[in-house]
Regions:
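Bacterial N-terminal signal peptides that target proteins for export
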Residues: 1-9
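Cleavable N-terminal signal peptides
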Residues: 11-12, 22
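N-terminal signal peptide c-region/cleavage motif recognized by signal peptidases
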Residues: 17-21
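Sequence context surrounding c-type heme c attachment/ligation sites in exported
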Residues: 29-61, 67-151
Length: 151
């Protein structure tokens, strides 16, 4: 009986290891869904900030700080899901993402930097500076979409 426990335990451990490894490797369609979810959330938290910057809604420091924090975290999430294995999935992502990955990564870095600046500015209370920074984020988003997203 004791002799069977070790091999059975070994088979279980190896099987669990293989299963865990398979789960760690995301499928292209899953990566696309993940990045689309992140982009949707970015829009959810950027939209109210744009309305503030445009003067369509009153400035609310608490909302600005909260949304800036969410955007800062979200700005770091989607980039690894633009894996070449997702190239043939049906999305609005242009092939240029994979053909000019250095420029795409530059936009990603700029977005991360601009959202970090917004977090810092939102804590300082300078409404004009915050509004200008929201505009800077919008410009990065727009430029990236112009170059890398289907119209």
């Amino acid at each position: 009986m004791r002799k069977n426990i070790l091999p059975a335990g070994l088979v279980f451990a190896l099987g669990a290891g293989v299963s865990m490894n398979a789960l760690a490797q995301a499928k292209p369609d899953v990566m696309v869904k993940q990045r689309q979810a992140v982009m949707t959330l970015q829009g959810k938290y950027l939209g109210p900030l744009v309305a503030v910057a445009q003067g369509k809604v009153p400035y609310n420091a608490a909302v600005v700080q909260r949304n800036a924090g969410f955007l800062d975290n979200l700005s770091r999430m989607p980039w690894d899901t633009f894996d070449p294995s997702t190239r043939n999935e049906k999305t609005r992502a242009l092939p240029a993402i994979y053909e000019n990955s250095a420029k795409f990564k530059e936009y990603a870095n700029r977005l991360e930097n601009e959202t970090s600046k917004l977090v810092t500015l939102s804590r300082g209370g300078d409404e004009a500076a915050v509004k200008a920074q929201i505009g800077a984020i919008g410009k990065v988003c727009g430029a990236c979409h112009d170059d890398f997203r289907q119209k």
